[in-house]
Amino acid sequence: MKIFDYLDQSNATYSVSEHKPVYSSQGMAAEEHEKGRYVAKPVIVKSQGTHVMCVLAAPHKVAFEKLKDVLGTDDVKLAEEQEIRQVFPDCEEGAEPPFGRLYDLRTIMDKALERDDHIIFQAGTHDKAIHMGMKDYLSLAKPEIADFAYHPERGA
């Protein structure tokens, strides 16, 4: 898988845990005995014909009006599952790691995810999670940071 090759070639510090297969980021948080705010979920959108990876915490949702402002266009919609499978051929559907740059995707991370010292994400499969420090993730993934998510705990 691209993610392990990239992390190993970058001499990244990370750990991998295995768990029963889960099909949601909140499910992974429960399996990993972690708060959902530490679990990064990538959401793939299509904007002006180009795919963009939006990374946010498991309990949060994309606020499309905010995202439209960030992207500078009203042409923003969720990518179709078939498109996502084509972009991430080495990943199980719905288990994409939050490293858009490995797939030539612009990556934008919600600023609320940045507040914590570590991050957990799916490793391309539904039964493995990668744990790493937030500083390492930011250094390797190089996401743009923006406010584009709805945060239920804050009401916005």
What are these regions (language model features)?
Residues M1-A156:
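Extended, low-hydrophobicity, polar/charged segments
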